[in-house]
Amino acid sequence: GMDVHVPVLDANDRLAERHRGFFAAKNLVVINVFSSLGSGETCLLHMTAEMLRGRVRIGVIVGDLATDNDAERLSRADIPVVQITTGTMCHLDARMIAEAMKKMPLDDLDVLIIENVGNLVCPASYDLGEGVRVVLLSVTEGEDKPLKYPPMFHSADVALVTKSDLADAVDFNRDAALAALNKVAHHAHVIE
């Protein structure tokens, strides 16, 4: 039952709090980004990195079940990238972040983006020590998506609607999507 998970989360949360203090001491903004596969996350990170180039120094930790091209695509943008392959684990945890942090030039960064594993079920309960949680909602995934993953959307500080250029093609109902977000993530800042 549940009792098995509680100690694991306790240890994780303690470590996450340590990370949080460490990040704060370095004035590092840490963003934990959640999305389903194919919702445009890596592309979005790429664009963000390009936009901020020369002004804000970004590092990225990419979580993935298996190695894949995400990290390669990002490292081409001259951004320090550390890939964490989680194997059978469907989420990143604070311990994995601790390992990745050792390989990241944290003193040279302003922003650390953690691209969580592409799935919205598991990661919601694992605190990584981030300052901001962003969850992506691609118009191609449908407006009821937040209702399917309430814990994830509820834990988000920011909900980002992606692939808006396809909204008409997929018949995306913006009002329904905003209503769904409002229902499960009423405190989240919605960006379209």
Task: Set out the residue ranges of the language-model regions.
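The Walker A (P-loop) glycine that initiates the GxxxxGKT/S ATP-binding motif of P-loop NTPases
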Residues: S35
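A generic "cationic amphipathic patch" detector
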Residues: I58, D110, P146, A169-F172, ...
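Nucleotide-state-sensitive switch-loop elements of NTP-binding domains
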Residues: M2-G21, K26-I31, S39, C43, ...
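Flexible active-site lid/hinge loop adjacent to a nucleotide/diphosphate
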Residues: L128, E143, L147-A167, A177
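Short, glycine/polar-rich helix-capping loops at beta-to-alpha or helix-loop-helix junctions
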Residues: T67-A71, K145-Y149, N173-A179
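Canonical P-loop GTPase G-domain recognition
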Residues: D165-E192
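Class I SAM-dependent methyltransferase SAM-binding "motif I" and its flanking Rossmann-like core
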Residues: S138
